């Protein structure tokens, strides 16, 4: 019998942990109606509760990165994993919106300690040429968590209730967190060797970036071409997860009076679109366009047309068209992965990680802001208008924000390795 390498087992467990991290991030969307009733919470309060997850996630990014470097992946994943478990269990048994908000904050901070440490583990345990492929694999597998938070979550809520639908995954997350602790045994010599290989490769790959921009050792935020990528990420990711992470099912249930299961099925197509798009856009950018900006342009145009179409609906468009539009939201919005990579490609290795981490944190701040604003606007419009009118007004806001993101694309320099162009002005 062939023995499975320990690093492969660890990789598998990290993938499973990431599935549960994304599940816990998005699973509140399917239980909005339950939360409003059980917690006696208006839409604005739910928006603030949900945004707490993303503020905490964003705030934890830098500490997680530092801890992964200083105390190692094993301790970081274990500590933050336990925090995420505690948050999920607290949320499952929350008796009011205040307790639920603190629970989501704990869950956000805890699940923030999985993605970055996973990348750190890949960079030290695998060869440099394997890194990009494995990153794509763990991201695609993780998106299964988004898929499970839709129709499967709706079915589970109907069977065991929303509280146990959070408690059960929390227990499973605890099991995998403990398993990761026992599987990840320090191997300093190998880690150092692999880490040196990664550093050498990154230095060679980004030499063009240093030459083109002339910013080695300087603060990235002082350069104007950083901000179009950051603003684009804030707007696109904020709109994406504000809708799919909280309001995507409620829109269908309240506006068109369809069942929770049907709404969950439609929401599932966002996850399917993200899984397909995560692989499609990378191949299109690397092998065919050999450029990043055209992919971002196509993706943003697609988002703009999708949201504009949703604004136009005054009646339920039917299951087929609704599923196609939700799929479009996923496949076009997942170009945020390309945008995030641009921050790494534009800057020298000394500051590329910090630049990428800042863009990543901004993405989650965007979600927190948009979820809060969306909840407030829903309460405002629902005082005198129908749910459909309220959501159409919100979709107009989303469309305008995506239009601003499209404008940002025109200010982005091309960052594809070997084709980096210096912006017109600094």
Predicted regions and their residues:
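Extracytoplasmic gate region of multi-pass secondary transporters
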Residues: 28-30, 223-281, 367-375
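Cytoplasmic membrane-interface "Motif A"-like loop-to-helix N-cap segments
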Residues: 70-80, 286-301
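C-terminal ends and interior cores of transmembrane alpha-helices
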Residues: 82-95, 301-315
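Juxtamembrane intracellular "pre-TM" segments in multi-pass secondary transporters
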Residues: 1-3, 188-230, 425-426
